[in-house]
C-alpha cells in the first residue's frame, strides 16, 4: 500500500488514483473506526490509500473479458489465531465480520439480478501471529482450519485460496526473520497439501521506501 499522493513516484502504479468504473468494490476496512462502502461502488482508493486490490484488478481486467468484483475486509495488526479464528474469534472478530460482508455483498448482487461466480480468496496476513508463540507454531494448522471453514460457510468445497508470501526485506523481516520464516513454513505446508490452495511468491517486490514511508509492504 501507499498514499495516493505518492503514486507519481512509482511509474508502474500510474493511474491507480482514479476510479476503475468497470470493477465493482465492496469493503470494510479498519480496526475500531471502520470505513465501509455500504454496498457496491466503483473500485477506488479508500482513505487516500492505494491498496493491492487496485493494481490486481487492473491487471486482471486487462486479461479477461467479463467484469470483476472484489470484496475486501481488512484490519491491520490482527491475528489469524485470534481475530480471524472461525471457531472462537476474539477482539475485532474479523472472521464473522468478513463472512457477513461477503454474504450481504453477494445478496445485493442477487437482488440486482447479476450473475456471478466466486473465483477465489486472496489471503495476505501473518506478521502479527509471530508475536504470539501459540499462534506462530500453529499457523499452518490455523490456516488449514480457516480455509476449511470458508469453504463450508460459502458452500464451495473447492474454493481456491491464494496465499501471499510474507516479505523479509523490511525492518520486521530482518529483525524477526526466524519467526517470519516459521509463519511462511506454515503457509507453504498448507499449500503443498491442498490442491486448491496456491502459495504466491511476493518477496521479490517487498520494499519500504521513504521517511515517512512512501511505498510500504510487509
Protein language model regions, located:
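Cell-envelope and extracellular/periplasmic
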Residues: 1-218
